[in-house]
Amino acid sequence: RQRQMCIRDRIDHPAQDLAVKFHGFLMEQLDSDYVDYLHQQQTNPYATKVIQGKENTQWVVHLLTDDIEDKVFMTLLQIKEVSLNDLPKLSVEKVEIQELGADKLLEIFNSEENQTYFSIIFETPTGFKSQGSYVIFPSMRLIFQSLMQKYGRLVENQPEIEEDTLDYLSEHSTITNYRLETSYFRVHRQRIPAFRGKLTFKVQGAQTLKAYVKMLLTFGEYSGLGMKTSLGMGGIKLEERKD
């Protein structure tokens, strides 16, 4: 499920800094033992992002497992104001709830829609780590690897992904268009190199393969993509395509 908090008025403050502050605020609302448990997880069962609109600032919290929903949902629902260190207290205008259940993902996978092109909008700085180094330009392999890992661990309870499937997806997908820029995400005193923008790719192969890609990407709108999605990195959305 997705939990979206809409803060009244627009906060004139950098979204990346707000995302880290909001994450700290969220952790303060939870039991310390549960926070320790979350820090030990290989893949965090939640993701957050901050989106600056013209009229308001949205703090979006994605709860990705039943366990964290049980622990966090009511806490989020009861928040009336937010204190972020040195910033003025913020009033919560409304809480919007969107759901993405297993039945919806299965419906996407079983759909007869034969979509070939997919466009990803990277709303917040997105990055990967490969062989110990930061990667500031996406490859189809890194995109699918991240989505498959998050989906496998959080939905299917599978710690490892199928390398053959990853190879097949990567070999049958080609980037056709992109408009990306380097973007740094600051966590405390560390500047993490990343990217933002838009990327379009084509999938060649059976309809089932394309449906699997659509399912992974739809899940990715909730799970985030790449590293540090719990802190606000890797927020993505799919652009609706008519082809």
Feature map (PLM): residue ranges:
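RNA-interacting cores
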Residues: 1-243
